[in-house]
């Protein structure tokens, strides 16, 4: 199964600890396509939730339901995680538009302190 930056796949986040996102849920592939194309054994992702929070930028980015993403979902930008590729359990559900991916990258810069 190939992965591409900005694609959304189902990921098995179990087991989780404390405030970590758990269960099987959609996640955005964040990792560079350079690593994805090299079939790197792990992938950096950000989980989604259907527990929407309005006006929560830069911690959340809302994606509208489309393609195989069945519900509106928030990208939990404060929860990026490296996972083993075996945790990715589906083909692509949908993908982020160029605008959504650029917004996600800007929010990540804020959350991770890259612009400090």
Question: Language-model features: where?
Answer:
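C-terminal terminal-subdomain/extension
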Residues: 1, 65-116
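Short, charged beta-turn/beta-strand-edge "cap" motif at the junction between a beta-strand
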Residues: 14-18
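Compact nucleic-acid interaction/catalytic patches
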Residues: 20-24, 28-65
């Amino acid at each position: 199964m190939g992965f591409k930056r900005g694609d959304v796949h189902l990921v098995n986040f179990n087991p989780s600890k404390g405030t970590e996102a758990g269960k099987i849920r959609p996640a955005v592939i964040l990792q560079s396509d350079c690593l994805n194309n090299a079939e790197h054994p792990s992938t950096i992702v950000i989980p989604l939730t259907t527990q929407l929070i309005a006006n929560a930028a830069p911690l959340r980015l809302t994606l509208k339901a489309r393609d195989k993403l069945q519900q509106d979902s928030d990208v939990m930008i404060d929860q990026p995680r490296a996972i083993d590729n075996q945790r990715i359990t589906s083909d692509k559900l949908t993908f982020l538009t160029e605008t959504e991916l650029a917004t996600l990258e800007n929010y990540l810069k804020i959350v991770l302190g890259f612009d400090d």
